[in-house]
């Protein structure tokens, strides 16, 4: 046996790390109880005083302080203790610790640890007098006392910890540390044989239980022995059934972040857990073979939305059986059945209420949060599918792009095909308008230029305050023929496939326009031969039939057909393909009825977001948006970004706004009241179209539609002057009967509780539901009859079934009456006072009833989906909802127009733009100071090009932005901030302002400047409005002047209305002199006061005035910016010096020019008229150079 001193430190360190907690061993009377309640076997060993010695020799303990059996052989130190105690139970195999004994049948096991008692000393040790204890040194005694205090002098109550089955040497070391080394034993072992058989029996029973428990706790090597290699996880442990479920679903959804419902939590596993921990800020920890992270069920929808906003695809795995049903089912020992029931991306998430526990049945359903006027329009969450084809096979510079955009939440679909240049400006413009949340792109990649634009756009939200844009790569993009066949099958028009050709259906009416290479949908023939168009289809009451849908396919360009097939195939995975059902929702992006604002114009004019932080505050949509409904906010955003080109439509909107402002009649007030507490009807009806609405949602929709339809009586006639306003009272009554009929079909009380099984007011509407209910009623009747029998058996006339923890039809019997309970009854649960049972008959009937309940759930859900499909067929409900949104937008614009100083614009046929007392709409609202108005007039008589010069910070950029915004607002149909505005319809507003680089796209500041200018020159027409701010400043002075001069000269020849801001006076002077009928000079006025120190103090007047102004007063702006005075003084001196040098050079040039003129005059080589022209040119040069003849 190792010496005490050598072994004490190792034992001390071992127990210090493990920190065992041991229950004290106690004796009462003649019996001793070893309590194993905390261990899985839940056994208690009863020991009497006579047989305790032999029993202890068998139940050798790991932390016992008694000496073991005299025949126990000691183990070596290396085998006795693990070198790394953290290896826990896995390092110890009990059969190696306790040697097999002949009388013990080779049994090896472990028992609980016992705190030593003074009266128990093994008889194998000699008496103290015969064998004195070895003498200890002072250091050993001190260490001994500390150890004894640590073991015995604590609270006295040590909870039992799993034994590690230490060998006899360690046990002896523990006894010695406890001071029991020299104690003897009162047992002589004479009666051991009489107790031996019972002791062995108890020991074997306990040993078997403990071996089973220890085997369960052993790590991979022991547990996984005999398992197939694929069943063993990375930790060496076999995969659990739950882990196998996750792996099976993950194998089919590798690109999805999965949440698995486990009890009252949703869990992430593996790499998904690490991702969730990083993005959601939750803890991920290793658990068997995977990392695990979890969230509570009531927070699921919050975390799902956050993950979607970060660009992830999220799947939700739910339990398809309840705990109560599982307990009485045949698979009670198997894991819960689970499957992937929800799959979302940012674009396809349509606010599924089944994920939100916050939507109670008693609360009124709102499909969006309450609308706050002035807040941002709801995100469209658009999905955009893009394909392309190079125009020239030899080069990828120019491509033909096909684009389909679908908004799953509203069902709106936008499509387009267009040719794009090398820098993909057209594509960028469409992305800026559509603002997609997700892009569907071919996996084999697009052209390099296109990929660069898409990558930049997807990464831009980090800097523009938007959510991340997700990119989904699609395999196997179909060819045109395959895509056409796919769409044909989708619209169920197989009967037309043989008769409708892909290229010869009314070719003369569906030809490609050769001029702009764009397809347009012209009127086409329906089956009855009548002409129809997409605009007319929008107002068809019954929606668009599948036969008409297939006829529209031949009108779509080839790239659009391919994009649409890709989008529909992708949407099918989410169950949202019905968004393409109604072709009346199809709109072409670029058409002749709307102005196309480029992405640069949207940014420079701050249409959707400000340029300061990318937020809503200070933008045009912020100024105009006073909508009361979500659908109104979405429509207004579309209006603002796509101004009208149709004068009749513009006048209709302006007239409606004017009447709203002036009319306070009863009917107008009723029209305003329609918008109060209005849910998002468009989004709600779209969810009905998908079959994803809840009964509560559907009831809310129908109640709202009935309320709207009841506000106006049929055949009221025109109660308003405006045709737009009259659409509501004329259309609303037409949906009353339909809405009321659908509403009457529902049991409202059950609908509010989302009770699908009892939803229908007429039980015979869906007979399958009633048949299943009848079967359930038979089962319940049999259970009631069986209850009568149970009352007789138990002699309890008042006996009733009870339900506990979701388990129904329990028979509760007091403990005192359990003797009369038949042996066939199954005990389900118990308390201290009662037992609860299921009889065999109850088990059989409830199993049958459970099957009927599951069938009822399926049948009722199918019936509700069929009812939603029936509602969705009535497309006029969506049309009326969109008209409500139109009224909301008009009311919002009227509220803006009510501000002082706004006027109704006047449209004229001839090209003209005349603004009197115009103001910047947003600056006027943001600043407390009054805005200084401006006057401007563009016409053939007044010229179409205005060059604006003047000092920095004088208001040049603000003024030109205000002019462009007034044009945009006028063509939205809104009133404008001016005293008077007369204008013709502009087909585009093009702007080139500011200076910034695009490093991500490989463009310098000057390259960006020239690229934007190039796009403008390629798209403008004589009816465009162009704003160019300081073109040419990104390069050297000479190159900048040359580019500015050439560009402005070219634009002036086109004849479009142009505002050109520059600090190059030479350009302004030369062009105004060369083209006086088209170009005129203007500047922002100021006052200059000379100071005693030789400097000047500048006061900006912010007034637009005719004439040229050379001075920029850059040093004065530097003074306003707070630059140090020494720098300002140096800059002023250098500026004066450079100005003097320039004037000196000009004097030399003038002197040489005068000498040349006089020489030619006296030599009679120049005519008098030529001399006069030369003198005039010289005078102009002197004037522009601030050099007088006297100088």
Swiss-Prot record:
Q: Where in the cell is it found?
A: Nucleus
Could you say which protein family the record assigns here? Belongs to the DNA mismatch repair MutS family. MSH3 subfamily.
What spans are recorded as compositionally biased (Low complexity)?
Answer: 122-135
Source domain of life:
Eukaryota
Subunit structure as annotated in this protein's UniProt entry? Heterodimer consisting of MSH2-MSH3 (MutS beta). Forms a ternary complex with MutL alpha (MLH1-PMS1).
Task: Give GO cellular component annotations, separated by semicolons.
Answer: nucleus
Listed SUPFAM superfamilies: DNA repair protein MutS, domain I, DNA repair protein MutS, domain III, P-loop containing nucleoside triphosphate hydrolases
Q: Where is the composition biased (Basic and acidic residues)?
A: 139-148, 193-203
Task: Tell me the segments the record calls region Mispair-binding domain.
Answer: 233-347
| Name of the protein in question | DNA mismatch repair protein MSH3
Biological process according to GO: mismatch repair; mitotic recombination
Q: What are the binding positions for ATP in this chain?
A: 950-957
Per the annotation, which location comes first and is thus the protein's main one?
nucleus
This molecule's function is given as: Component of the post-replicative DNA mismatch repair system (MMR). Heterodimerizes with MSH2 to form MutS beta, which binds to DNA mismatches thereby initiating DNA repair. MSH3 provides substrate-binding and substrate specificity to the complex. When bound, the MutS beta heterodimer bends the DNA helix and shields approximately 20 base pairs. Acts mainly to repair insertion-deletion loops (IDLs) from 2 to 13 nucleotides in size, but can also repair base-base and single insertion-deletion mismatches that occur during replication.
What keyword terms does UniProt attach to this protein?
Answer: ATP-binding, DNA damage, DNA repair, DNA-binding, Nucleotide-binding, Nucleus
Report a single Gene Ontology molecular function. mismatched DNA binding
Disordered: region residues: 1-82, 118-148, 175-203
Spell out the Polar residues composition-biased ranges.
1-11, 54-65
Underlying gene: MSH3
The family database entries (Pfam families) matched by this protein are listed as: MutS_I, MutS_II, MutS_III, MutS_IV, MutS_V
